């Protein structure tokens, strides 16, 4: 009964409860991503590791997922994401590990990492922050 309750709660959090009786193979890629997150939440571990969690999701669903992961982290779980959407990572992550050329180039808060200029050098873009705090990139040149 406790396992069933954990699964139901995880499915409610991820908006997947209506799909409980559907074959996972019949789900879209984005729907599967949400089901996999529900599975991770239901297991009750202390850490969630996700590789490109926004893949296959439309823009709105990507931000809804990031908001959900933020609340999961606020609840005490460690949430580790591998992602290539730089502005989203800068906006949502408490800490960022910047990789380039197979090496760790820096690991810090968004603000501290941006101040080093490493992000700009690695990606050949200029990392900027709007007055409202939202991060964005400008292509150089």
Regions found by a protein language model. Give the residues of each.
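Conserved ABC ATPase signature
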Residues: 23-27
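Conserved ABC ATPase "signature" region
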Residues: 2-19
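H-loop (His-switch) and adjacent beta-strand-loop-beta switch element
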Residues: 96-109
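ABC ATPase nucleotide-binding domains
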Residues: 121-141
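H-loop/switch region of ABC-family ATPase nucleotide-binding domains
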Residues: 83-84
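Catalytic Walker B motif of ABC-type/P-loop ATPase nucleotide-binding domains
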Residues: 48-52
């Amino acid at each position: 009964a406790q396992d069933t309750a954990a699964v139901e709660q995880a499915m409610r959090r991820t908006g997947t409860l209506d799909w409980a009786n559907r074959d996972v193979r019949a789900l879209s890629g984005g729907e599967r991503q949400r089901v996999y997150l529900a599975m991770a939440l239901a297991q009750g571990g202390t850490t969630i590791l996700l590789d490109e969690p926004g893949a296959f999701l439309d823009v709105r669903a990507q931000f809804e997922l990031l908001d959900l992961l933020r609340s999961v982290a606020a609840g005490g779980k460690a949430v580790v994401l591998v992602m290539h959407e730089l502005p989203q990572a800068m906006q949502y992550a408490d800490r960022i590990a910047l990789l380039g050329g197979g090496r760790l180039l820096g690991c810090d808060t968004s603000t501290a990492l941006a101040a080093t200029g490493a992000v700009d050098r690695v990606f050949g873009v200029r990392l900027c922050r709007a007055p409202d705090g939202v991060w964005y990139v400008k292509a150089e040149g």
